[in-house]
């Protein structure tokens, strides 16, 4: 039975939760090469709640260092196209300092590996991921317009360097297929431990929403399917209806049934938790009915004129060139070209992209 730890925490005492996670899910780290991967969506201040908090990263780095590994690498691949934004993202978020000198730009060196031929015969993955003997994933408790939940499985999408993410988004072509692709990326190298920052979480139009939620928890597990199922349940979702969890379960990667997960700690739903708009992309019901309603319920990105600064970042980052600057210097979406990957929403520095 998979286990998930739920422990009360603040950013001031987070070391206690990290210690407990390592006690419950021990790793033989001495003499091993270790990769620690936080969730670094883009260059933003930690107080915005978009990335793994620096206090969590520092606590994990300190713990790993005390276990005498041969090597520590702290890294992620922020953004969709921007290889050059890697160092900037770590500096602005405070994660560079929290990495205690172990940061590396893991997007600089990549290697091609075999992939699901239904999407692409091969993908590029950061060499640091393949070289690591132990991988510790540090996801953030957040909503996501495409997957509902950003947790352990989705965090592994950052194993792909920027432009590779865009190519895979394009190859998937639709949200349901992208859910399959997310799991296939996760399977390339499944992390050994997940420590999820839920001290301050995100609700609403994630993964870059201004709606933060004080939750006061650290979650941990050695099974991402169980972890993400618990997160979904806390948000008020039925984990069994999330496409990516269904896919992961079908592939034998874990169980999403809460009754079959050993929860260590107090599991409670978050009252009145705001989920992102549901357009039929992330949740699954009757397959035939889903196909009929899919095009009618599909969410599209739209710029909020009160927040948009016409910086053009979303236009530049769109994997399929579905965005252009329209009247009034607001980005406009070509509905026929858009593949609803919502990368524009993720990357917008002003949080001006909403889903409608």
Tell me what each language-model feature is.
Residues 338-355:
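Short Fe-S-cluster ligation motifs
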Residues 326-337, 341:
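Short linker/helix segments within small regulatory modules
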Residues 1-305, 309, 315-320, 324-330, ...:
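N-terminal and secondary-structure boundary signal
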Residues 310-314, 341-344:
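Cysteine-cluster motifs in flexible loop/terminal segments that predominantly coordinate metals
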């Amino acid at each position: 039975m998979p286990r998930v730890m739920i422990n009360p925490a603040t950013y001031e005492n987070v070391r206690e939760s990290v210690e407990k996670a390592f006690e419950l899910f021990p790793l033989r780290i001495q003499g091993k090469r270790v990769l620690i991967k936080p969730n670094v969506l883009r260059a933003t201040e930690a107080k915005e709640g978009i990335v793994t908090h620096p206090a969590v990263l520092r606590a994990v780095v300190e713990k790993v260092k005390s276990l005498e590994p041969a090597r520590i690498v702290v890294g992620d691949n922020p953004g969709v196209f921007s290889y050059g934004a890697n160092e900037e993202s770590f500096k602005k978020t405070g994660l560079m300092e929290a990495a205690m000198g172990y940061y590396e730009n893991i997007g600089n060196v990549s290697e091609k590996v075999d992939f699901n031929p239904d999407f692409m015969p091969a993908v590029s993955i950061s060499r640091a991921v393949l070289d690591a003997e132990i991988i510790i994933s540090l996801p953030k408790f957040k909503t996501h317009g495409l997957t509902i939940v950003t947790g352990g499985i989705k965090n592994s999408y950052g194993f792909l360097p920027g432009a590779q993410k865009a190519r895979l988004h394009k190859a998937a072509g639709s949200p349901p297929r992208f859910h399959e692709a997310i799991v296939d990326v996760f399977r390339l190298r499944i992390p050994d431990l997940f420590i999820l920052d839920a001290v301050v979480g995100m609700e609403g139009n994630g993964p870059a929403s201004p709606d933060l939620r004080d939750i006061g928890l650290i979650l941990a597990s050695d099974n991402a399917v169980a972890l993400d199922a618990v997160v979904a349940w806390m948000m008020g979702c039925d984990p069994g209806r999330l496409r990516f969890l269904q896919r992961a379960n079908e592939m034998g990667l874990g169980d999403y049934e809460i009754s079959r997960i050993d929860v260590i700690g107090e599991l409670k739903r978050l009252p009145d938790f705001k989920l992102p708009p549901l357009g039929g992309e992330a949740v699954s019901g009757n397959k035939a009915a889903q196909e009929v309603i899919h095009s009618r319920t599909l969410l599209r990105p739209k710029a909020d004129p009160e927040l948009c600064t016409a910086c053009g970042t979303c236009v530049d980052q769109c994997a399929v060139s579905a965005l252009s600057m329209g009247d009034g210097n607001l980005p406009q979406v070509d509905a026929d070209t858009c593949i609803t990957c919502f990368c524009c929403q993720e990357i917008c520095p002003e949080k001006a992209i909403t889903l409608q």
